[in-house]
Amino acid sequence: MELTQLINSVSSIQITGNIQRKDVADIVYDSRKVQKNSVFVAVKGFNNDGHRFLQEAIAKGAIAVVVENNEALPDDLITHSQIAKILVKDSRKALAELSKGFYKNPTSTLKLIGITGTNGKTTSAFILKNIFQSNGYKSGLIGTIANYIGTEKVDAKLTTPESNDLNKMFYEMIQAGCEFAVMEVSSHSLILNRVYGLCFKTAIFSNITSDHLDFHKSFDDYLKAKKILFDNLNNSSFAIINKDDINSEQIVKDSKAEVFTYGISDGADYKIKNIIYDLTGTDFSITYKKTDYKIHTSLIGVFNAYNAKHPHLQQLIVWGLVQKK
């Protein structure tokens, strides 16, 4: 994709310098990975600031740089280097927008399911991927333990990778023939705009407890972070929430998605009951519209039954509703 076309993807404040009619080789936020004809996005991190490495990126052949701080790169250096400087309000959002454009908006094609919550994300994501695979649907996974592009395992460095890495992996999933993608969505990634612009078909809320307050500072901030995922769903999406968690209604309060609830609580759309476990695993049933669905999992214990029920609900809900749309 030409730079002249790609810059239309980003919400810019000002563009100066030379916008070259060249194909962009890559979008990068790590100056060590800059190659000729890359676009370098200067992102402020916790320990480093990408604005410190702008000149290094230019020296390595970047044809454009994206900055939040207009003073980080003098205009005379831009003129001398014959590159473009793109000033934005939020570099992380710009990285997501550029990556989405560069990789041809891959989540508009994939059926993307996001799982968020303090507990149960990893177990639910892996079981759900296996459900899709066992039914003949090739799928990808983004998670804490590992990422998968179909059956190919890719090492995971973060629970939810940066937006550029996410869009690249989703693009690769499509190339590999994947129809579904399941991902863990951390609260950190929601605040840091790593999942900004992704098209989620379904979002699942497991629960929320007073963890990660070192990052979010308060429980209210933590709750607001989780809520971002559901606020950004459109009216053709689905939200699946744990009715047993007292914060579940707050999570979907402003969501446009169709909402389904699950849990042991009365009034849940999908009511969990009759949980029995022994050394062979756990049995329970899910009742929906007066019909009982019996479930068995090799995971042992009430807690693991709670984890297991999320993906089994997907088998009942996502399996039917996502494909219907």
Where are each of the predicted segments found?
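N-terminal leader/targeting and accessory segments in enzymes
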Residues: 1-97, 246, 271-276, 300, ...
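N-terminal-biased segments
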Residues: 1-20, 119-131, 135, 266
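Short, well-ordered coil/turn elements that cap or connect secondary structure elements
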Residues: 10, 21, 60, 80-82, ...
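Short, well-ordered beta-strand core segments
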Residues: 40, 65, 85, 203-204, ...
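Short, acidic/turn-prone active-site loops that include or flank metal/cofactor-
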Residues: 71, 90-93, 207-211, 264-267
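Active-site regions of enzymes building and remodeling cell-envelope glycoconjugates
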Residues: 77-88, 154-157, 256-261
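Phosphate-binding loop of NTP-binding sites
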Residues: 93-243, 247-257, 288, 309, ...
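Adenine nucleotide phosphate-binding catalytic loops in nucleotide-utilizing enzymes
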Residues: 216-223, 227, 253, 257-325
